């Protein structure tokens, strides 16, 4: 649900300070955890902190889970430990049923833990797609702690996704007021303003503040580069920001993919663009958007249909309900393979995945005319696409009007 740097879970209940990244620091940190547990094998706090360390810094998920379980056995009613274990199950194991069970236990143990309430809300939105319950949990979390900038920002993102732009901006304002130097909050607010194509000067000020707060955030630098390239059309400064973003985190797949798009669309440098696409896929091999973007590049720019189809198939396997990827794959099947039956199957799946996406509906209507000669069905689908565009345009008009009133 996040935009810039917002993980699916808003935070950890960990009591300990995270170690620095160098290996020596990690080794010293691990030794400290081990000594604490040797001194008291039933110290739930130490066990939980060690579990977080093993998952986040060592990637040793089996040992991490063992420590989470020991921590919960030592203190079954510790809401912080339960919440961290739920985050682990959702984010690392992908075990959503067990994660939800543990989130509920954590909230029963302490209904006033705003971190757990916010994490559960993000889980409900991102992993369950239950936006109504997610909104209810965010409301509870913010009632408990009205100044939690992470929860306010995550809730703003949910409201933006639901098209409630006025309330979304209210939450972003509150998040910035609560934590004026938080680069993630500032960057997310800037991206929110950018998506509705308004308040250019405010967007730049927010990005400037975000970068001043965290000059090495790859996601924020890339977000600013997107703004400079797509809205300001300042391509030289945009490329400088993309390069800084890649230097800040050479393994951020989203950043690499955005830079690849810039190199393709603006610089027409297809050799470097493909290098960035490949690096993006290597960095995040199950990211549907990255795979789909590389597939589009392979077929539209290089004309390499075999590799393009491989990427489309991987993208659909990674997320079978991504409507845009399904729609693009359908276009590929019709145009490059002339496999109209499979193309129509993909178009239908795309429309089922998002019945109100005017891009998806428009592509399907074009297919019905060009491949099926079915103008009657195409007309109905175009009507739906037009209605979807009208609703979206009206929502954005209202959002821009609200911005001008502020």
Locations of regions flagged by a protein language model:
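TPR/TPR-like (Sel1-like) alpha-helical repeat modules
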Residues: 365-369, 373-393
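Conserved alpha-helical positions within TPR/SEL1-like repeat arrays
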Residues: 17-21, 45-56, 80-91, 115-126, ...
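Long, contiguous interaction/recruitment modules in multidomain scaffold/adaptor proteins
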Residues: 1-22, 26-28
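Residue-level detector of the short coil/turn that links helix A to helix B
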Residues: 24, 58-59, 93-94, 128-129, ...
């Amino acid at each position: 649900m996040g935009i810039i740097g917002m993980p699916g879970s808003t935070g950890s209940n960990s009591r300990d300070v995270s170690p620095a990244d160098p290996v020596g620091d990690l080794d010293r940190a691990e030794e400290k955890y081990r000594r604490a547990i040797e001194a008291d094998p039933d110290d739930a706090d130490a066990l939980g902190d060690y579990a977080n360390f093993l998952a986040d810094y060592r990637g040793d998920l089996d040992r991490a889970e063992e420590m989470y379980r020991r921590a919960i056995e030592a203190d079954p009613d510790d809401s912080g430990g339960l919440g961290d274990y739920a985050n682990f199950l959702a984010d690392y194991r992908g075990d959503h049923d067990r994660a939800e069970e543990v989130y509920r236990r954590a909230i029963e143990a302490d209904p006033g833990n705003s971190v757990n309430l916010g994490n559960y809300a993000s889980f409900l939105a991102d992993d369950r797609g239950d936006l109504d319950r997610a909104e209810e949990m965010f409301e509870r979390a913010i009632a408990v702690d009205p100044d939690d900038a992470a929860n306010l920002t995550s809730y703003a993102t949910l409201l933006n996704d639901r098209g409630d732009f006025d309330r979304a901006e209210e939450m972003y304002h509150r998040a910035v007021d609560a934590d004026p130097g938080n680069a993630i909050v500032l960057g997310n607010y800037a991206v929110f303003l950018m998506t509705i194509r308004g308040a250019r000067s405010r967007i730049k000020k927010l990005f400037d503040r975000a970068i001043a707060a965290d000059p090495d955030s790859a996601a924020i630098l890339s977000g600013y580069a997107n703004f400079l390239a797509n809205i300001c059309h300042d391509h030289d400064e945009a490329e400088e920001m993309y390069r800084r973003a890649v230097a800040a985190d050479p393994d951020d797949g989203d950043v690499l993919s955005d830079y690849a798009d810039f190199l393709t669309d603006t610089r027409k440098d297809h050799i470097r663009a493909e290098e960035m696409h490949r690096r993006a896929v290597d960095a995040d091999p199950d990211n549907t958007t990255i795979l789909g973007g590389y597939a589009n590049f392979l077929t539209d720019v290089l004309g390499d249909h075999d590799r393009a189809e491989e990427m489309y198939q991987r993208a659909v396997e990674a997320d079978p309900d991504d409507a845009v990827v399904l729609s693009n794959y359908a276009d590929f099947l019709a145009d490059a393979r002339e496999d109209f039956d499979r193309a129509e199957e993909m178009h239908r799946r795309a429309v089922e995945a998002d019945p109100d996406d005017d891009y998806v509906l428009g592509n399907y209507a074009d297919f019905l005319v060009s491949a099926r000669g079915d103008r009657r069905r195409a007309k109905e689908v175009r009507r739906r696409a037009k209605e979807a565009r009208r609703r979206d345009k009206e929502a954005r008009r209202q959002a821009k009007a609200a911005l001008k009133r502020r």
